[in-house]
Swiss-Prot record:
EC code(s) of this entry: 1.4.3.5
Any one Pfam family match given in the protein's UniProt record, by short name: PNP_phzG_C
Domain of life: Bacteria
Xref: HAMAP family: PdxH
Binding positions (substrate): 8-11, 66, 123, 127, 131, 191-193
This protein's encoding gene: pdxH
Species classification: Bacteria, Pseudomonadati, Pseudomonadota, Gammaproteobacteria, Alteromonadales
Assembly and interaction partners: Homodimer.
Name of the molecule in the record: Pyridoxine/pyridoxamine 5'-phosphate oxidase
Organism, as annotated: Shewanella frigidimarina (strain NCIMB 400)
Amino acid sequence: MSDLSDIRREYTQGGLRRANLPVNPMDLFEQWMQQAKDAQLSDPTAMCVATVDEDGQPFQRIVLLKKFDDNGFVFFTNLESRKAKQIATNSKISLLFPWHPLERQVAVLGEAEPLSMLDVAKYFMSRPKDSQIAAWVSKQSSKISARQALEGKFAEMKAKFAQGEVPLPKFWGGYLVRPASIEFWQGGEHRLHDRFIYTKTDADWNIDRLAP
């Protein structure tokens, strides 16, 4: 077994104070997302999406956030994928944005609900054509014999859709994650990190500081 106990560093980039927090957590998320983009982080919209199967086994994967507003967080996926099947069984979901260079992370707990076909189609048509074709090619999470089979299918579908628009696959869609809570974590000196959690109420958000 490899001993990794000596890998550590101090967090020095600043703290997070209650007096500076906005009432709406999405305002703080927007600010942090913009700062992650301004810092030119690699894939600032990348988030770890956790779902649970019918046996209670959790699964995680990296997915790109495509939109957010006061309603929540939006991502798109193959509806035959493992994550989509798990969401159909249990809509509870967790998102994590790991912005390590900024010594920050944001954790979201909530429920996922399917997007309308209009919203899905609108986003699908905005994708590069090769990405649209790739959506037709991959039966996500299924076992394949070799990469060559995937590449061959891509070439076949690229020829099929060479002219005109690529239609929206029936098995492709998206989700809105409506947050029940959003936790903001900022690294602090001596491991005295700052953690604030926003919890949704019927009318507003409660804000609490958590011990690091």
